Amino acid sequence: MCYYKKREVGMSFRKLGHFDLIVMGAGSAGATAAIAAARAGSKVLVIDRLPFAGGTSTAVLDTFYGFYTPGEKAKKIVGGIPDDVVSGLAGYGSMIERPNTYGAGTGVTYNPEHLKVVWESLIGKSGAKILLHALLQEVTVKDGQVRELVLATRAGSCTVSADFFIDATGDADLSHFAGFGYEKAGDIAPAQTLTTTFKMVNVNAAERKKIDKNRLHELMQEATEAGYALPRREGSDHITPVANTTATVMTRLDSVRKNEKGELESVLDDPFFLTESEIAGRAQATEYARFLVDKVPGYENSSLYGFSTLIGVRETRRVYGDYRVEKEDVLQARQFDDQVALCGAPIEDHHSGDGTNWVYLPEGSAVGIPLRSLIVRDSINTMVIGRCFSATHDAHASIRSMAQCMAMGVAAGVSAAIAIKDKEEVRSIKFSKIREALAKTGAVLEV
């Protein structure tokens, strides 16, 4: 466990300014929140620890899932600013729609390098300001109100303040440092695993298409029995907009473990654990690449091209909101009076072991995502979006899809802008006002 020293009284840091809204995290959720709030007239700063915007969408993955309901007669359930993102990718000739064989609906596969530019362009054009290479160190809170952040930058420690905050860090870093309540992955239900993704080049796509996913999994099992170190035997690969290049989701590493005292710790508790996971993930990916070249049709002359910038993290902390979305909400495709987004993705639980648990929603249906699940229970001026929003383990395993993260971002950005303008808490605003504002952005609120 790491303990953070508070700065001494009287010690001052360089101040970077005061904003209406600070969004901590510029991933799919945070970037859309910043864009939505800035378009609504707020003075916005969005901050990220990486050197580019997009978070997992640009550092780890290359496909948006969640735009459609499940089934053959799919309905589009995410729109507005997320459509602007897809249009930006299409402008580069850098996206394809790809059917998904795992029940998550049609996916939008893209070139992550172009997506970085798209995200940053949309943020800039919205009027929001972006700060990269900035790591959150400390949060100042008084009576449930976040006041100021301390950031570690290449220029040293700096402070920045705002009237309203959105935690879009993925790991709930803002809420954690603020002392707000959350459930840590693994405390109640088994935590989802980590994945280092990788790409292969010089792939013969026509040959690769001759075997389906079931045969690929059989080949993985056969290779494991022959001595290949493949801990996950249900991994996947797919074509990309880049010719003769495939992307993979194959590796698997545990995100929690017991320390020397027998206490459960995650990759957020021990920096050496996260470091070891990054190193092990790349080593594991290299073994999967060897398997592909040796055993899978179409890969005979291919080469490993690149690893994800970061190891992919599915679940760490889930903040307690005014409402927690639960498993039964998802499976019943429950609708809420205050829903601000929709999700039709299955519960996709990448637990420890060699398999993945899938539980599907009824065809053509979607669960509503209530505004209350985005309002931090312990704060009067903070919302939480993305994969650290308020949900149980199972519900989170469905709603963490990137299209839903974008939809949550729009909802939080619009709600925050109204709260700032009206000088009210989000929970005090008439929902009809938020719903009307969301509809104007093109957001889809009903199936």
Predicted segment positions?
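Conserved N-terminal/central alpha/beta ligand/cofactor-binding core
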Residues: 2-7, 36, 42-43, 48-138, ...
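Beta1/beta-strand and adjacent pyrophosphate-binding region of the FAD-binding site
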Residues: 15-27
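Alpha-helix C-terminal capping segments
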Residues: 35-41, 177, 411
